[in-house]
Amino acid sequence: MTKGTQSFGMRHNKSHTICRRCGKRSFHIQKSTCACCGYPAAKTRSYNWGAKAKRRRTTGTGRMSYLKKVHRSFKNGFRAGKPTSAATA
């Protein structure tokens, strides 16, 4: 048997499994670290050379249920509470 392409077909064991943080099949079983998000590290793995990867998982790619409302509050000067009586009259 040669040591190149032919021998890759003989492989059966999985080196990576599903990561519980990012959900990708990037969690290395023996190292017990995720190649995608860096789990179990506290901070998410991200590098400047991976600008495209950053774009995929940065703020604005999800629901942003709170941040969507911030723009409207900013327009009104972050005023809270009921309007004054002068405004209603």
UniProtKB/Swiss-Prot annotation:
Biological processes annotated in GO: cytoplasmic translation
- One Gene Ontology term, aspect cellular component: cytosol
Q: Can the keyword Metal-binding be found in this entry's annotation? A: yes
Q: Which GO terms describe its molecular function?
A: RNA binding; rRNA binding; structural constituent of ribosome; zinc ion binding
Q: How is the cofactor bound?
A: Binds 1 zinc ion per subunit.
Sequence positions that bind Zn(2+):
19, 22, 34, 37
The answer to whether UniProt assigns keyword rRNA-binding to this entry is: yes
Zinc fingers (C4-type): give the ranges.
19-37
Q: What else is known?
A: There are 2 genes for eL37 in S.pombe.
Q: Which family does it belong to?
A: Belongs to the eukaryotic ribosomal protein eL37 family.
Function, please?
A: Component of the ribosome, a large ribonucleoprotein complex responsible for the synthesis of proteins in the cell. The small ribosomal subunit (SSU) binds messenger RNAs (mRNAs) and translates the encoded message by selecting cognate aminoacyl-transfer RNA (tRNA) molecules. The large subunit (LSU) contains the ribosomal catalytic site termed the peptidyl transferase center (PTC), which catalyzes the formation of peptide bonds, thereby polymerizing the amino acids delivered by tRNAs into a polypeptide chain.
Record-given protein name:
Large ribosomal subunit protein eL37A
Q: Which organism is it from?
A: Schizosaccharomyces pombe (strain 972 / ATCC 24843)
